[in-house]
């Protein structure tokens, strides 16, 4: 009797273990899938942006609407840093991530379409 009850307990333990194992596996699989899909979308955005030929003039207008409050009308910095020569300190991919992700507080993140991001990059390159 004790043998059958111990083997029943073993089976119950194995079932519970397998349930937990597969649950953890499923959660990890979903988490990794979400991460990689999001990462792919960001790379797609960056690639699309970098393939465009932006306009410094349009980028200047965009800058004046969204950025002067922190970076100043001449982009020399106020609350935010001076952006002259920013393209010598950061590459275009890093700048895109900074603008869209707000990586260094208090910089907010901006949802900006690829053509406007390309325009902003051209404007920043013109500040050198």
Task: Give the positions of each predicted feature.
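N-terminal Lys/Arg-rich, disordered targeting/topogenic segments
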Residues: 1-13
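C-terminal capping alpha-helices of c-type cytochrome domains
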Residues: 11-41, 111-128
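Extracytoplasmic/periplasmic beta-strand context in beta-sandwich domains
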Residues: 32, 81-82
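Electrostatic cytochrome c docking/interface patches
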Residues: 35-62
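Extracytoplasmic electron-transfer domains, predominantly the class I c-type cytochrome c fold
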Residues: 74, 84-128
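Iron-sulfur (Fe-S) cluster-binding segments and ferredoxin-like electron-carrier domains
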Residues: 76-79
């Amino acid at each position: 009797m004790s043998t059958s009850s111990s083997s029943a307990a073993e089976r119950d333990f194995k079932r519970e273990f397998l349930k937990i194992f597969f649950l953890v596996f499923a959660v990890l699989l979903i988490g990794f899938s979400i991460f990689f899909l999001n990462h792919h979308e960001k790379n797609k955005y960056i690639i699309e942006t970098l393939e465009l030929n932006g306009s410094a003039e349009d980028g200047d207008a965009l800058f004046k609407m969204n950025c002067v409050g922190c970076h100043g009308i001449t982009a020399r910095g106020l609350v935010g840093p001076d952006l002259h020569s920013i393209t010598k300190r950061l590459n275009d991919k890093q700048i895109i991530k900074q603008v869209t992700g707000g990586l260094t507080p208090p910089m907010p993140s901006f949802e900006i379409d690829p053509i406007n991001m390309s325009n902003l990059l051209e404007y920043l390159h013109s500040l050198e």
